[in-house]
């Protein structure tokens, strides 16, 4: 299991660096070749991925009886789609959007209740309920969800913050995210080696997420006073400690599940991380637009225009009004960074209370 930790560190470094490198490459491609290039570049990457997958060595495992779970799949889809649409409706903070948002939330709750009931009865459930009853596994999966929420919302909204609030170009925004990518890769590799040597697991995300939470508080309250170099250094530091999580989560659930359910356990981590990323980004966007609309509806419209057309094509306003709108947008991003800090704080407590502390 300890050697597995080292290789999980490699995998986590590659996977998370790929996630954070996307905005870096996207900014440069948009600046040089236009926004269409960020979609076209995925074609050769997908073909390369398919080729590498085809060349993987085959590994035969013991076959187990399996039955599809179409009811679980439908209920899960209804739950996720309705809840995300409800969060999107709440971003408008308009009275005419509230009935639809409330109805979608209610539909999501009903679908969730029915989903839990279905998964406890299905012979081959979409969601491995039996595994999730184990404290070490459900806490690790919840930690993966919090990590996904914090990381993906960060790499989604930091580029917007840099361009809209600080006036950076897409290319310079991409370059400012390079330290975050380097930090995450380095943190994942170092954590994998430390777990392999010491056998300790949760101590690393406990310490790492505490530091990340402090970093997010610095971004929330003092980012406007940071120069470009200081901000790049903060993102490097932030990434270094964000890299302490995913490798530990994977090796923890694999150790807790046993060899027969190793695949289910590993899949549950990626599943949880993806769900956390989707919901986390939607929640942060809801907080951002809610605060902005509450402070200044005109600023919300201006921000939406900046998001759609770019900073240079926003509405022409007197300098004093532009400064006021910029201040309101900066305040909304403060709330967004605090929402991200809430995710990392929850992850900190999940890691702290995980019963599997050594492997």
State each model region's role:
Residues 31-143, 150, 168-169:
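Hydrophobic transmembrane-helix bundles of small-molecule transporters
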Residues 24, 28, 32, 55, ...:
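Membrane-interface helix caps of multi-pass small-molecule transporters
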Residues 1-13:
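Cytoplasmic helix-loop-helix junction between adjacent transmembrane helices
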Residues 31-41, 89-100, 169, 290-341:
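A membrane-interface helix-boundary motif in multi-pass transporters
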Residues 49-60, 184-191, 318:
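Hydrophobic, membrane-facing alpha-helical anchors
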Residues 71, 97-107, 111, 123-295, ...:
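12-transmembrane solute porter fold
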Residues 29, 56-57, 86-87, 119, ...:
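Hydrophobic alpha-helical interface/terminus motif in multipass membrane transporters
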């Amino acid at each position: 299991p300890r050697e597995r930790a080292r290789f999980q560190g490699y995998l986590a470094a590659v996977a998370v660096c790929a996630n954070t490198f996307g905005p870096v490459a996207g900014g440069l491609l948009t600046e040089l070749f236009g926004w269409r290039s960020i979609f076209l570049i995925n074609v050769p990457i997908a073909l390369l991925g398919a080729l590498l997958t085809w060349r993987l060595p085959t590994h035969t495992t013991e076959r187990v009886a399996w039955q599809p779970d179409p009811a679980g799949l439908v209920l899960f889809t209804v739950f996720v789609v309705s809840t995300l649409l409800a969060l999107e409706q709440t971003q408008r903070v308009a009275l005419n959007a509230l009935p639809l948002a409330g109805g979608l939330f209610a539909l999501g709750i009903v679908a969730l209740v029915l989903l839990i009931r279905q998964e406890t009865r299905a012979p081959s459930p979409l969601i491995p309920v039996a595994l999730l009853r184990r404290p070490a596994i459900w806490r690790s999966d919840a930690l993966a969800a919090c990590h996904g929420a914090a990381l993906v919302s960060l790499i989604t909204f930091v580029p917007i913050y840099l361009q809209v609030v600080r006036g950076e170009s897409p290319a310079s925004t991409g370059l400012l995210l390079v330290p975050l990518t380097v930090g995450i890769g380095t943190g994942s590799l170092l954590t994998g080696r430390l777990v392999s040597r010491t056998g300790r697991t949760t101590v690393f995300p406990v310490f790492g997420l505490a530091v990340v939470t402090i970093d997010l508080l610095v971004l929330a309250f003092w980012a406007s006073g940071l120069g470009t170099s200081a901000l790049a250094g903060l993102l490097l530091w932030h990434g270094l400690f964000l890299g302490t999580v995913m490798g530990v989560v994977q090796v923890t659930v694999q150790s807790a599940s046993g060899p027969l359910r190793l695949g289910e356990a590993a899949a549950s981590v990626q599943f949880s991380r993806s769900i956390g990323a989707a919901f986390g980004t939607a929640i942060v966007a809801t907080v951002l637009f809610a605060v902005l609309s509450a402070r200044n509806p005109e600023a919300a419209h201006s921000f939406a225009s900046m998001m759609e057309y770019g900073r240079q094509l926003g509405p022409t306003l007197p300098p004093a009004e532009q400064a006021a709108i910029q201040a309101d947008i900066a305040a909304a991003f403060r709330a967004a960074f605090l929402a991200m800090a809430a995710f990392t704080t929850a992850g900190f407590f999940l890691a702290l209370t995980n019963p599997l502390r050594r492997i």
